[in-house]
C-alpha cells in the first residue's frame, strides 16, 4: 500500500508510477538533485508500454475490484519512497520538494532502481490506504486488505 501525498489523492485510489524518486536522498552538496542518489538518474521512469496498457485497462479493473471501489480513481504520476514515514512533521517539506508527487511508500523506488539496473520493465502500482499529513495517524480510512485488493485487481488486468 501507499500513503497519499498529492492533495487530489484520496484514500482508496490506486497510484501508478510515471516516475519514482527517493524522499530522503540528499546529495545536493555534491551537485545532485534532492531525491537523487549519486551515480543514478534524478528519477526512475515507469515503463512506457506498461503505463500505456495500464491507462487502457486500469480504471475499469479498479472500478470492479471490490464492492466499494466504484468511485476510486487510478492516478498516474510521480511516486516516492523513503526510509521513514511522511508525517505531519515533514509533509510540508516533502510536498515543497516534490510538488507533483502523488504518494509515498518505503519500497517502490528501490525496486525501480534495481529494475533499471537489470534492464527490466517496471511500474509500481499501489493502493492508497491513508493520507500523509497532520492527521496521518488518525485518517486510516481503508483496510490494508481493501487497498491491496484494489491494486492487485489493477495489476492483474495489466498482466492479462
Model-predicted segments: where are they?
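Flexible loop residues that form catalytic
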Residues: 1, 19, 130
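A short, hydrophobic beta-strand-centered structural micro-motif
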Residues: 1-4, 107
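Mid-sequence, gly/pro-rich, charge-dense loop/helix-turn segments that line enzyme active sites
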Residues: 4-99
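A short, terminal or domain-edge coil/loop segment
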Residues: 29, 50-60, 125-138, 160
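Conserved active-site and cofactor/substrate-binding residues in soluble primary-metabolism enzymes
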Residues: 45, 49, 106-109, 142, ...
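Predominant activation on well-ordered alpha-helical scaffold segments within soluble catalytic domains
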Residues: 55, 109-112, 116, 152-156
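A C-terminal functional module that forms or caps the active site or interfaces directly
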Residues: 82-134
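His/Asp/Glu-rich mid-to-C-terminal helical/loop segments that flank catalytic regions of hydrolases
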Residues: 133-160
Amino acid at each position: 500500500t501507499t500513503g497519499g501525498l498529492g492533495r487530489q489523492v484520496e484514500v482508496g485510489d490506486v497510484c501508478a508510477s510515471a516516475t519514482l524518486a527517493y524522499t530522503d536522498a540528499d546529495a545536493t552538496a555534491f551537485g545532485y538533485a534532492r531525491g537523487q542518489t549519486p551515480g543514478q538518474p534524478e528519477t526512475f521512469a515507469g515503463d512506457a508500454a506498461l503505463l500505456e496498457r495500464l491507462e487502457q485497462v486500469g480504471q475499469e479493473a479498479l472500478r470492479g475490484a471490490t464492492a466499494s471501489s466504484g468511485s476510486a480513481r487510478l492516478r498516474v504520476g510521480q511516486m516516492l519512497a523513503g526510509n521513514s514515514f511522511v508525517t505531519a512533521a515533514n509533509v510540508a517539506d516533502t510536498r515543497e520538494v516534490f510538488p507533483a508527487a502523488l504518494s509515498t511508500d518505503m519500497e517502490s523506488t528501490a525496486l525501480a532502481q534495481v529494475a533499471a539496473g537489470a534492464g527490466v520493465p517496471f511500474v509500481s502500482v499501489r493502493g492508497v490506504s491513508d493520507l500523509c499529513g497532520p492527521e496521518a495517524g488518525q485518517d486510516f480510512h481503508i483496510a490494508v486488505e481493501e487497498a491491496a485488493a484494489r491494486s492487485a485487481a489493477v495489476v492483474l488486468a495489466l498482466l492479462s
